[in-house]
Amino acid sequence: MRTHYCGHLNKSLAGQTVELCGWVNRRRDLGGLIFIDMRDREGIVQVVVDPDMADAYEVANTLRNEFCIKLTGEVRVRPESQVNKDMATGEVEILAKGLEIINRSDVLPLDFNQKNSEEQRLKYRYLDLRRPEMSDRIKLRAKASSFVRRFLDDNGFLDIETPVLTKATPEGARDYLVPSRVHKGSFYALPQSPQLFKQLLMMSGFDRYYQIVKCFRDEDLRADRQPEFTQIDIETSFMTADQVREVTEKMVREMWQELLNVDLGEFPVMPFSEAIRRFGSDKPDLRNPLELVDVADLVKDVEFKVFSGPANDEKGRVAVIRVPGGAELTRKQIDGYAEFVGIYGAKGLAWMKVNDRAAGVEGIQSPVAKFLSEDVINGILDRTQAESGDIILFGADKANIVAEALGALRLKLGKDLGLTKEGTWAPLWVVDFPMFEEDDEGNLHAMHHPFTSPLGVTAEELKANPAVANSNAYDMVLNGYEVGGGSVRIHNAEMQAAVFDILGIDAEEQQLKFGFLLDALKFGTPPHAGLAFGLDRLVMLLCGTENIRDVIAFPKTTAAACLLTDAPSIANPAALEELAIAVTAAKAKDAE
C-alpha cells in the first residue's frame, strides 16, 4: 500500500511519485490550498492539496485529525523561505494527486496538544502510543533489544528459552501462581527470573547463554518497577567475575555509543561498604557531589544523647552532609527536609549553618550548638571542610536508618538545589556485597539470592561466621539506578547446602524445593557466573524519562492493573470449579 514512510522523505526524492499511509496529524486551509501534516511511525511530512486536483481536494475537505488515510503524490522541494528546520522532512512537501480515506476517527478521548492524565493515557494506550514522543521511545527500545542480540550473538552467546510455568522458589518477592487443572491443588509459579534454569544450562555444557525474557514479581510497585518486566539474562561458565563484568560493561558502553553517540568511559569499581559510607546507598548517583561524612568519634563524649547514644552503639552511626551554599535554606525548607527523612525512620534533622567560618563557633547558627563543645564543632567543620555559607545536616540513629535517610536526602538536595549534573552519565560497579543481611529479629537473609557464591571462604568458614562474609556479587549502577546485577554462583553441593542451612532451610525443605539443583551439583558442575539487566530500566535511561511505564507498550498501573483491558478480572465460575478453586475473598466481599 505504501512506497515510503513519511519521515523518510527528503530532497533526493524530488520529482518522484510516492504512496504514503498514515494519519492526519493536523489539517489547515490557507488561501484556497489545504495543508495536511501526515504522520506515521517514522515522522511527519507536509502535504499540499491544490484545488486543481478536484478529487483529492474534495476528500481533503472532509478530513479531520486522526483519520487514517492513503496518499499518492509528488515530492517537491520547498522554497528556501518555506523550509521548516524543526521537521526532519522540512525541506520537502508532497503535492497530492490522489487521496483516500481508509478509516474515519471519532473525536479522540485524548488531547495531544495538552497534558493528559496518567489514567486516560493508560486506558487509551493505543492512542497514546501514536504520539511521536511515545513512538520514539518504543522504537528506541526495539533498537536496544536488537543491539543486545547482535552483541551477544557476536560474542558466542546462545539464545536459549527457559520455562515460564515453573516451580516456586524463594527469590525475594511473592510469586504469581498458576493453578494446574491436571494436578488439582498444585500450582505453577511464573518465574521471577530464569536463575535456576540458566545455572542448569551451564551444567548442560552451554557455556554462554542469554535470553531477553519476561519475568514476574508480585510486589509493591514503584516508578521503576512493574509486575511483569523484561530481563536481559546472561550466564557463563569458566569465566571469572572480572571477565563477566568486562563483557557486560562492553555491551552497555557500545549500546550507549551506538544509540546515543555517548562514550560512557571505563566504569569505576566501588566496594559496597564504601558506597554505603560515602553515599548512604548501594546504587549511588555519582553525578551528585554531596557525600556523607562520619563524625561518631567526635561526638562520643558529648552530653547530647541524640548524638552520643548512636555514637557509642556498635550498630549506630552519626554522619553529616555538608551542603555548599545551604545556609540560605529557610527554616521552613529545613523543616520540610526533616519531615522527608522521617519517611525513612529518622527522628529528626539537626542542622548547623556556617555563616562565618573564620569566626569559629561565633559564626555558627544551630539549635544543637549549645550541646557541643568548641572543639567538637571545630572538629566537625574541619572534617567536612565547611566554608562560609554552607549548612551541615546531621543523621544519628541505627546505621541502616542513617544510611537510608541521609542517602535519600542527598539525592533530594542534589535535585532541589541543582547540584546534580543533569544531562551527564555516571556509571560504576558496586562489588563485595555482604553475603547475608540481618532482619529486625536477627535472622539472616541472602542479600542477593541463595545461589550466590561467598567470596574467598570455605563452607566451614562460612558456617562459622556467616554475618561477616562477603559475596562474589556485583551490580552495575548508572545515574543512581541499579541497571544490572549478578554474581559468581555456587557450583558445589556442600557450599550450597551450607548456605541453605544458614538461611534456616532444613534438609527436608532443601530436598523438597531444591532437590533437583542439589542433585545436579553432584555431576561435574563447572564454575559459572552471570548477570541480568533490567531492559525496561536501561531503556528508561536511554530515553531520559524517570518512569518505566513510559518505555513499555502496555504497562500496568501502580496497583498492578491494566486500565486498557480491565485486567485482572473475575474468573469464570465454571473454570474455577474445574480447577477446584474457591475464591473466598470474593465470597466474603459479597456477604458484606
UniProtKB/Swiss-Prot annotation:
CDD domains: AspRS_core, EcAspRS_like_N. One of its GO terms (biological process) is aspartyl-tRNA aminoacylation. It is found in: Cytoplasm. It is an enzyme of class 6 (ligase). It catalyses: tRNA(Asp) + L-aspartate + ATP = L-aspartyl-tRNA(Asp) + AMP + diphosphate. It comes from the Bacteria. The keyword GTP-binding does not apply. Residues 195-198 are annotated as: Aspartate. Its main location: cytoplasm. PROSITE patterns: AA_TRNA_LIGASE_II. Keywords: Aminoacyl-tRNA synthetase, ATP-binding, Cytoplasm, Ligase, Nucleotide-binding, Protein biosynthesis. ATP binds at residues 217-219, 226, 482, 534-537. Transmembrane segments: none annotated. GO terms for cellular component: cytoplasm. GO terms for molecular function: aspartate-tRNA ligase activity; ATP binding; nucleic acid binding. L-aspartate binds at residues 171, 217, 448, 489. Its EC number is 6.1.1.12. Belongs to the class-II aminoacyl-tRNA synthetase family. Type 1 subfamily. Homodimer. Catalyzes the attachment of L-aspartate to tRNA(Asp) in a two-step reaction: L-aspartate is first activated by ATP to form Asp-AMP and then transferred to the acceptor end of tRNA(Asp). This is Aspartate--tRNA ligase. It comes from Vibrio parahaemolyticus serotype O3:K6 (strain RIMD 2210633).
